[in-house]
Amino acid sequence: PWSKYLTGAQGTAPKNGFDPLAYWVERAHALGLELHAWVNPFRITKGGAAEFQALTADHPAKLHPDWVVEYEGDYYFNPGLPEVREYIVRGAEELARKYDIDGIHLDDYFYPGSGFADGAAYAKYGKGFSNIGDWRRDNVNQLVKTLGERIHAIDPGLSYGISPSGVWADKSSLPQGSNTTGGYESYYASYADSRKWVKEGWIDYICPQIYWYIGHKSMDYATVARWWADTVKGTGVSLYIGMADYLAGNSDPKSPWYGTTAIERQLALNDTLPQVAGEAHFRYRLMAENPELLALYAEAYGEESQEPAEPAYLNTREHDAYIQGNDGRFRPEDSLSRAEAVAMLARLTV
């Protein structure tokens, strides 16, 4: 059913058949931007029992109450059920088929915590696992792997990535972990084995949320960024660093996030790591409302970042010479970019 955040009432469709995602895709492409659909796979509500009860009767959580687990007042789909994982994968497939999106991105929420009440599912499906933690990680791994395979079967050009919490595991917990201590280890806290996703090549890119400053005593930004750079090395998986723009601009001169100094130092460090392909900034509104950050990014990314890139979807009447040297025959040694392929198809239909 339709989200309440679109029309104010869950299950109520926008007027006149308006499809907001189709509109966003159209406008993004017109500006030369890619649009990646952001998916939060297992979370149903964050507003407690009242929000859950307000869900419409045709919501999957109401149609399949056996899929639902309550945890600390909020409600989640149970990752340990094969039918839940299949439902999420089919949702991603619908996005890939129905919309001209450029990618699908999974958020960092998988299991909400170790006290998740999934004992019955573990008893039914956990045979072959020595502990519930390994079984939970395998459930998430199955979703990550299968979802990528299925959307790439529909559109091999889709970019598929995930933004896990910045620390996979401390070295004191796992020998392959980072030299960090005492923080949130996603391997254990949300059962997200993000290192495995990279090493197995199940995703196209990883975007760890490294929301700490350089010099943090237990989770130093530089330490974590270098760990991720080393992790992706040689895998073919791209690395984009999730930046904490929302913390920048603190008015307290004693704060490590005072002004834009912390972000500036992080960008400089990223530039020294060849594996870092770029940054993702959380979040746009806070960045747009911070003139100092905007000025910093204009300098860091170049003035061209202030202007829309040329659209990948070309008006072929204005780009008659775009495909150079093509005589209508395609040879084994030839190759086409996505934009060229779209342009050629457009020529066949006008």
Language-model-detected regions and their locations in the chain:
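Substrate-binding cleft of secreted/luminal carbohydrate-active enzymes
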Residues: 191-217, 228-313
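Aromatic- and acidic-residue-enriched segments that line the glycan-binding/catalytic groove
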Residues: 1-12, 43-72, 109-128, 173-183
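The substrate-binding groove and active-site-proximal loops of carbohydrate-active enzymes
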Residues: 3-17, 71-86, 128-140, 182-183, ...
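Substrate-binding cleft/loops of secretory-pathway carbohydrate-active enzymes
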Residues: 47, 154, 159-207, 212-227, ...
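Aromatic-lined substrate-binding rim segments of carbohydrate-active enzymes
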Residues: 1-40, 124-154, 220
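Active-site-adjacent "subsite" loops/lids of carbohydrate-active enzymes
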Residues: 25-26, 36-98, 188-192
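Aromatic-lined carbohydrate-recognition surfaces of secreted/lumenal glycan-active proteins
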Residues: 34-46, 105-108, 134-187, 237-248
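Extracytoplasmic Gram-positive cell-surface binding/anchoring modules and repeats
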Residues: 314-349
